[in-house]
Amino acid sequence: PALLDRSVEPPIRVFESGSILLYLAEKFGALLPKDPAGRTETLNWLFWQMGSAPYLGGGFGHFYAYAPEKLEYPINRFTMEAKRQLDVLNRRLADNAYLAGDDYTIADIAVWPWYGQLVRNNVYSAAEFLAAHEYTHVQRWAEEIAKRPAVIRGQRVNRTWGDEDSQVPERHEAKDLD
């Protein structure tokens, strides 16, 4: 993804999800703690997602859900990695409401579409295969985030499939989502 911030002169170009999240959090002073420990913890998890998600999407998701031929070795290999990543998240969320601690941050925004939606069985139809029910803390976190009004609205942006009530194929103003 890419963003061009025309609210400044000269316009600033920003690309890649993590960079966009960090840029917007700094620009608007939200979703990124200001204290060094909280900020660092948030960035740790943001960058964890940047490094981990390709194994989930490009590895597990591809071989489990999309590959034209189901090959045992890559499915087993990437399943093991997906479960390891879910375990890392589950351990973190056992003692924390959100990834960086008590507050919802850009780390949660980055991680939830991949791992939260995975355990909710909304990507790859793999929750049962991965025994997602065993990751109870990830499940709790995923459900809490799914109920956030901004998340509910955000999932409708540029959506062209599913129930018509859940679609906003083109967005021009914030009121388009209300």
Identify what each model region corresponds to.
Residues 89-100:
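Hydrophobic alpha-helical bundle segments that form small-molecule/ligand-binding pockets
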Residues 78-86, 114, 141:
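Alpha-helical packing segments of well-folded alpha/beta enzyme cores
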Residues 56-61, 99-128, 134-140, 145, ...:
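GST superfamily/GST-like fold recognition
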Residues 155-178:
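Acidic/histidine-enriched, glycine/proline-rich intrinsically disordered or flexible terminal extensions
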Residues 25-26, 51, 94, 120, ...:
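Residues at helix-coil transition
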Residues 3, 20, 89, 108, ...:
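Residue-level signal for nonpolar/aromatic packing positions in well-ordered secondary structure
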Residues 1-76, 80-83, 97:
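GST-like domain detector, emphasizing the conserved glutathione-binding G-site
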